[in-house]
Amino acid sequence: MSMRPVPGSLSSLLHLHNRQRQPMPASMPGTLPNPTMPGSSAVLMPMERQMSVNSSIMGMQGPNLSNPCASPQVQPMHSEAKMRLKAALTHHPAAMSNGNMSTIGHMMEMMGSRQDQTPHHHLHSHPHQHQTLPPHHPYPHQHQHPAHHPHPQPHHQQNHPHHHSHSHLHAHPAHHQTSPHPPLHTGNQAQVSPATQQMQPTQTIQPPQPTGGRRRRVVDEDPDERRRKFLERNRAAATRCRQKRKVWVMSLEKKAEELTQTNMQLQNEVSMLKNEVAQLKQLLLTHKDCPITAMQKESQGYLSPESSPPASPVPACSQQQVIQHNTITTSSSVSEVVGSSTLSQLTTHRTDLNPIL
């Protein structure tokens, strides 16, 4: 495809293509009319004015593209600018050649693709803009340099504005690319932070509400329920203790009664034994000077004439002392045994005395 000289309006188109999100610079570099195309200056001046107006409108709408909410309003503006460009091209068909029409059509297609990419571009992060913007800068640079090679003098005259415009573009987009994004991030952070602040209090407030309600219920129900439960447990424990005490007291009372009964029996036996001892003493005292004792002594003296008289009263006294000692010191069983022994001795003594009498 043979490249032909590009008029100044195409440079404005290229700048418009790169400045869809950026405001236009304060001064647009002027373009010299191409001597090869007659009547181009008369035709291109209104085109440049129209394009400058459109580009200024687009540049004013450019900073708002960072806001995703403004994208539906920007697309109609792009479509209106596209329609105006088409109308301008149709009104001046003689001013453009076939090559220029092809380049303009290519630019229109790229503008349409750019418009299609603008909604998607808002979804991407900040580094994506730096990756998509630089490839477009060499493209107008390649189109403009071949246009100026056949004319060395205008090239030098137009080269300075071109570099000035490029330097202004490179300096100005960096300012506009970096400046809209921090408000966007800060806006997102400002939008996210109130939401998180609203979510965090709800998350912190919601769990304490049931716990606080439970605590209040427990505090409200504790005095009555705890009092009632405490009284019931206390009553149950008191009844158990009383029953145990009653059983223990009854067992002790039974044992005491048994012991008292045994004690009374023993005391009665002791009194009976004392009475028997007193009776036996009286009997011995009455029979102390009895002639029977003398007869017994004499009978014993016949058996042993030397030792029998003095020895006869000694066993009687010894027996009496043994009987008295046993009745005083021994228990009831021993006293019964002693009593029975004394009774047996007395009976034997009486049986011995009876035949003599």
From Swiss-Prot:
Would I find Transcription among this entry's keywords? yes
Q: Where is this region: Basic motif?
A: 226-246
Question: Tell me, what's a Pfam family for it?
Answer: bZIP_1
MF terms from GO for this chain are: DNA binding; DNA-binding transcription activator activity, RNA polymerase II-specific; DNA-binding transcription factor activity
Q: Where in the cell is it found?
A: Nucleus
Q: Where is the composition biased (Basic and acidic residues)?
A: 218-235
Q: Kindly give the Gene3D superfamilies that the UniProt entry links to this protein.
A: 1.20.5.170
Q: Where is the bZIP domain?
A: 224-287
Some GO term, biological process aspect, for this entry: which one? adipose tissue development
Could you tell me which InterPro entries the record lists for this protein?
bZIP (IPR004827), bZIP_sf (IPR046347), bZIP_transcription_factors (IPR051027), TF_CRE-BP1-typ (IPR016378)
Note down the stretches annotated as region Leucine-zipper.
252-280
Q: Where is the composition biased (Basic residues)?
A: 120-129, 138-175
Region described as Disordered: 114-239, 298-318
Q: How does it assemble?
A: Binds DNA as a homodimer or as a heterodimer with JUN or ATF2/CREBP1.
Q: What does this protein do?
A: Binds to the cAMP response element and activates transcription.
> Known PANTHER family for this protein?
CYCLIC-AMP RESPONSE ELEMENT BINDING PROTEIN
Family as reported in the entry's similarity comment:
Belongs to the bZIP family.
The protein depicted here goes by the name Cyclic AMP-responsive element-binding protein 5
